[in-house]
């Protein structure tokens, strides 16, 4: 049974990463993609907040939105606004699981990263969710690719 679950998790991850490809990424400097590992489907309507670290080390609201039917969130920012800095992406996983009638362990998923320190890049933040665990990864690419 455990090997069956591991196989399904790996398969979901493979599908997830293959879908996190260049569809909307070429136009968006920051894109978020979320997959529900329990149901093996996109995580729809996950609230996403993006913050930028200020000079005084506080977090300032930068952008927000909800994932679509494909589990993706595009159009969070523009190349002009997405300047070099430290950013935090917060996924409201508790509300997502509560909507499905599941009581989760985590309140939210947080990904903190430095962006554009080596020139302008495209960032895809990907998250694979379950009620008691999560995994994140990032795809960073040159906008000319």
From Swiss-Prot:
Subcellular location as annotated: Secreted
UniProt keyword annotation of Magnesium present: no
Annotated signal peptide: 1-20
Modification type Sulfocysteine: residues: 28
GO molecular function: hormone activity; thyroid hormone binding
Function: Thyroid hormone-binding protein. Probably transports thyroxine from the bloodstream to the brain.
Protein's UniProt name: Transthyretin
Source species of the chain: Erinaceus europaeus
Gene that specifies this protein: TTR
